[in-house]
Amino acid sequence: MCLVALLGACSKPLHVGTLQLGSRLNGDNTIATHTTRFKPDDKIYAAVLTADTGSSTIAARWTYNGQMVSEEERRVSFKGAGATAFEFKSASGFPIGEYKVEILVDGNPVASREFRVE
């Protein structure tokens, strides 16, 4: 039990409402151009939308043909709805194939989306 919980200072973990994929972001970190099909030189973004107040570590784990190729995490805190964006990067372009992004909140998998580079 969190001692400061008695004083109302502990915050609950965030709940992921939606996971968006696309090639362009809006100013509020939501996806402007939704897609699950990309070209090798496209930018690839995942936007994690939360609808409640809370604080958590959100991670994006990117895989290609079943092998993890990138992972990034951020500590975030929101008072109400929020969006956290992650960019999947490749300096030389993405190989053609099947990909997946998995979202973890405080180390626990909560959402995933498959996508394709063609």
What are these regions (language model features)?
Residues K43-A51:
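Short edge beta-strand/loop segments characteristic of extracellular beta-sandwich folds
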Residues A91-V117:
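Short, exposed beta-strand-loop hairpins at the edges of beta-sheets
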Residues V69-K79:
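Solvent-exposed serine/threonine-rich low-complexity stretches and specific carbohydrate-binding patches
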Residues R75-S77, F115-E118:
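Short beta-strand edge segments in extracellular beta-sheet folds
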Residues L6-A9:
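C-terminal motif of bacterial Sec signal peptides marking the signal peptidase cleavage site
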Residues S11-P40:
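Short, compositionally biased P/S/T/A/G/V-rich stretches that sit at domain boundaries
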Residues A60-G66, I103:
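Conserved aromatic beta-strand anchor motif in extracellular beta-sandwich/beta-rich domains
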Residues F78-F88:
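Aromatic sugar-binding surface patches on proteins
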